[in-house]
């Protein structure tokens, strides 16, 4: 009769373990699944309590995720560092601990008992391991009824701990996949917003061909370009490059663009606009973050373009008469780097029919081939010169194509943005 009873108990234990195994395949919620595992441990081991602790590797802490037998306890969460107490030691060493008299073991921490009024008389603690064998938590059973935990109990709890480890590992993968999907959606939204901030159409200027284009290195980039007809009739032209690439720099460049637009609608005086925007950005940006920028105002009738460089360069102009390219000095400090800075008086370039202003960010110049050689300014100038009779947008596309061929498969490391201002005819 006793044999039959023992056999029945073993069969019941196996059924409970199989029930947990089936639940792993059908239950997505981690807390529900761990709760089933803790309940199964309490029943199979015939003990008063079972707790599942999960490891926070960044903080090197264990925290109780689910527990049985604690409905009347004033403590709802237990959190402690790895290495402290029995559970902390198991998390640190990965070794099972089975103690029949915890209060006579120096590793036992009685603080929880004192706070809750509970009395621990025996405990069995095992690590939870993920797919790679790394420790992801600890499962602990307390106070076996009728005596200390046995070696058979240890085997049974090891089976449950393996299932708990699989559940935690699966949930970690699911959460990582969900996070990646959310980030992908967020990046797509951010990219759409950033693209929406770019000019939709070239400016309507008789005798002029103005084109802009950008290709971020990531989903979003720190480069921007813009143009805006201002109240005095001139065309403001901007190209900017915030440090880095990605969402953070994209926000910085968007703020710089908005500040320049807002300021230019009220004031078209470059010596006042640039320091003002520099100061406003300097208040917002953290140290080490800044925007290099070209800000120019084009008088389309006279062909005069006054500009200030806030750290952006090179600034190039192509002369149709001589077939040569001139590089203009760029002395200004990037926007947002040093609030209170003064800037040199604006420079001026006069564009005659066939002449071009060439603005390219460093993503073009610094894109390297597999041997580390950068595309550089000379190659860029050569492409522009050979295709000078084409529309501005086509020239930009051909430059990017040339850089891509030169790179021979190396990944684009920085955002590539360009603006070309080309005078096609003289004044009427």
Name each model feature, range by range:
Residues 174, 178-358, 408-428:
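… and, occasionally, acidic/histidine-rich disordered N-termini of signaling adaptors
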Residues 39, 49-78, 82, 103-104, ...:
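GAF sensory/regulatory domain recognition
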Residues 73-97, 328-331:
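Acidic/proline- and glycine-rich, intrinsically disordered low-complexity segments
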Residues 131, 148-172, 254-258, 352-353:
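Amphipathic alpha-helical "output/dimerization" segments
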Residues 1-9, 73, 130-131, 135-136, ...:
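Regulatory loop-to-helix N-cap segments in sensory/regulatory domains
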Residues 121-130, 137:
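A short, aliphatic-rich beta-strand micro-motif
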């Amino acid at each position: 009769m006793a044999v039959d009873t023992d056999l029945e108990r073993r069969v019941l234990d196996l059924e409970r373990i199989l029930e947990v195994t089936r639940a792993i395949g059908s239950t997505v919620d981690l807390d529900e699944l761990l709760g089933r595992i803790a309940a199964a441990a309490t029943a199979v081991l015939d003990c008063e309590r079972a707790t599942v602790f999960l490891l926070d590797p960044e903080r090197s802490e264990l925290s109780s995720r689910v527990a049985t037998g604690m409905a009347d306890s004033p403590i709802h969460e237990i959190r402690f560092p790895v290495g402290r107490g029995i559970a902390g030691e198991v998390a640190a060493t990965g070794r099972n601990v089975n103690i029949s008299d915890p209060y006579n073991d120096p590793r036992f921490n009685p603080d929880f008992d004192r706070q809750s009024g509970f009395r621990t008389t025996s405990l069995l603690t095992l690590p939870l391991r993920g797919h790679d064998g790394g420790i992801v938590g600890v499962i602990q059973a307390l106070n076996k009824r009728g005596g200390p935990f046995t070696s058979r109990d240890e085997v049974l709890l090891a089976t449950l701990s393996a299932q708990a480890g699989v559940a935690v590992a699966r949930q970690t993968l699911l959460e990582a996949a969900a996070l990646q999907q959310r980030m992908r959606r967020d990046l797509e939204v951010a990219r759409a917003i950033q693209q929406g901030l770019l000019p939709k159409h070239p400016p309507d200027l008789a005798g002029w061909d103005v084109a802009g284009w950008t290709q971020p290195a990531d989903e979003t980039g720190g480069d921007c370009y813009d143009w805006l007809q201002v109240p005095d009739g001139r065309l403001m032209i901007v190209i900017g490059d915030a440090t880095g690439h990605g969402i953070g720099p994209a926000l910085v460049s968007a703020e710089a663009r908005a500040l320049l637009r807002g300021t230019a609608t009220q004031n078209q005086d470059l010596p006042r606009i640039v320091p003002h925007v520099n100061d406003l950005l300097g208040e917002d940006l953290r140290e080490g973050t800044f925007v290099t920028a070209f800000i120019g105002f084009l008088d389309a009738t006279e062909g005069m373009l006054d500009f200030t460089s806030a750290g952006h360069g090179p600034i190039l102009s192509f002369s149709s008469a001589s077939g040569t390219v001139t590089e203009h000095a760029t002395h200004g400090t990037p926007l947002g780097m040093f609030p209170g800075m003064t800037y040199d008086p604006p420079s001026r370039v006069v564009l005659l029919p066939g002449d071009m202003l060439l603005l390219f960010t460093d993503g073009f110049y610094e894109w390297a081939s597999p041997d580390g050689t950068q595309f550089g300014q000379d190659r860029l100038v050569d492409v522009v010169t050979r295709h000078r009779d084409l529309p501005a947008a086509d020239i930009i596309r051909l430059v990017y194509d040339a850089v891509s061929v030169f790179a021979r498969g190396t990944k684009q490391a920085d955002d590539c943005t360009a603006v070309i201002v080309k005078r096609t005819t003289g004044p009427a």
